[in-house]
Amino acid sequence: GEDRIEFKNAMKDLGIGMPRSEVAYTIDEAVKIAEELKYPVVLRPAYTMGGAGGGMVYNVDELKVVCERGLQASLVGQVLVEECIFGWEELELEVVRDADNNKITVCFIENIDPIGVHTGDSFCSAPMLTIPEDVQKELQEMSYRIIESIEVIGGCNCQFARNPETGRIVVIEINPRTSRSSALASKATGFPIAFVSALLACGLTLGDIPCGKYGTLDKYYPDGDYIVIKFARWAFEKFKGAEDKLGTQMRAVGEVMSIGK
């Protein structure tokens, strides 16, 4: 996750919902925020990878321990204290934008495990299998507004949470770079996200890059007639003292992808 304050302000300007949250720079600030949001809460350190230093806490004692760890893990000493939305659907889109503001969606990814399990540990499918088409279009529209606002050139991973009972959608975070999810999306679709991002960074546009049956990349859309399922590989037995438990910190050491119809 990058700067949580900048991200929160940007989403507010766009009118895109987020989980209720506040930023803390000290343990005392985090304690005060958690009391207002009510336990349990989730702590998300800024500028970390794989959810390092964060986690869900159920009381003030747990908060102090995790917050101290998170502040140390964050490059800027910043932790987001966030309302708990565990159990919601977790949905991801891999999108690409060029300097002319052309935007395409490479892949729709549905996490089979709900919010609360890190995406790197979650079973997931591409394309989305249980999410209505109108919801997918809404997520795509939000993703395009986000990457246009922050002026991403290249690939970007956008992560959302959806309450299956009320339909409420919030954005959790984005990764404005080639990420672990980008690697999965590339393998699932055959779309070379990192390579294309490099070309776009050099000044080309999506319309300049040829792409098989689509003609050029600006006309690309995900239309595979197959399903991809990813599941994680863990190695708890190799790490002394490691707890065999999943949460907001990524535990997987690898992953396996299967393709079928």
Predicted regions and their residues:
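ATP-dependent carboxylate activation and anion-phosphoryl transfer catalytic cores
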Residues: 14, 37-40, 50, 57-261
